């Protein structure tokens, strides 16, 4: 008799990749009374499983999703999830390796568009880490304009950018929140800068310097 933990682990594996598991699926999964086979029922669960993970990725990378478009973003996300399935108890870390995955997926010729997409993914990943990480809310902190003090804070992260990413990110987020057309937001200029990502009152802030 298979214990519950083993059965759960097996079922998760089947949802990710049912190929080669057909016989066990027929033995362990009860077919419905509507004519659906056990494989059909597992396929429904599998589709829902991946759809939910793509939704998590869209939540973590909303500006990237708007920039790439829903279809292309979903293709990248599904390919990424197949290589890096969730391993942690929280889905906050699901997109941890997504910027690196996109970097390795770049064309061999280093074009600006691909570099921009990778940097944008990196920025949104850092924003997610700062949002879910330690912060200054219980301590005295300096105003959000004093960059030297901000950089000295343990929870601050920095990123070297080849584009004015902070402006583009903020403009797209504003368009999303107000129901505007994100396609009207101009792509950022290819001007290098460094961006500090930090937190104030549980909100993530960006400061270019």
Regions found by a protein language model. Give the residues of each.
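N-terminal, charged low-complexity regulatory/assembly segments
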Residues: 1-136
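Hydrophobic packing positions characteristic
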Residues: 82-209
């Amino acid at each position: 008799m298979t214990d519950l933990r083993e059965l759960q682990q097996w079922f998760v594996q089947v949802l990710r990749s049912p190929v080669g598991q057909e016989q066990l699926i027929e033995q362990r999964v009860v077919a419905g009374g509507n004519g659906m086979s056990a494989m059909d029922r597992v396929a429904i669960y599998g589709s829902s499983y991946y759809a939910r993970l793509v939704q998590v990725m869209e939540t973590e990378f909303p500006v990237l999703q708007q920039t790439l478009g829903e279809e292309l973003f979903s293709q990248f996300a599904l390919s990424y999830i197949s290589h890096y399935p969730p391993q942690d108890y929280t889905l906050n870390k699901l997109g941890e390796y997504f910027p690196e995955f996109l970097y390795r997926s770049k064309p061999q010729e280093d074009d600006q568009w691909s570099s921009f997409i990778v940097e944008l993914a990196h920025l949104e990943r850092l924003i997610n880490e700062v949002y879910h990480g330690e912060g200054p809310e219980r301590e005295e902190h300096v105003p959000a304009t004093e960059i030297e003090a901000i950089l000295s804070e343990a929870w601050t992260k920095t990123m070297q950018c080849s584009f004015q990413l902070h402006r583009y990110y903020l403009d797209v987020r504003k368009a999303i929140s107000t129901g505007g057309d994100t396609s009207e937001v101009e792509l950022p200029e290819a001007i290098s800068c460094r961006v500090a990502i930090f937190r104030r009152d549980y909100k993530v802030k960006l400061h270019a310097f």
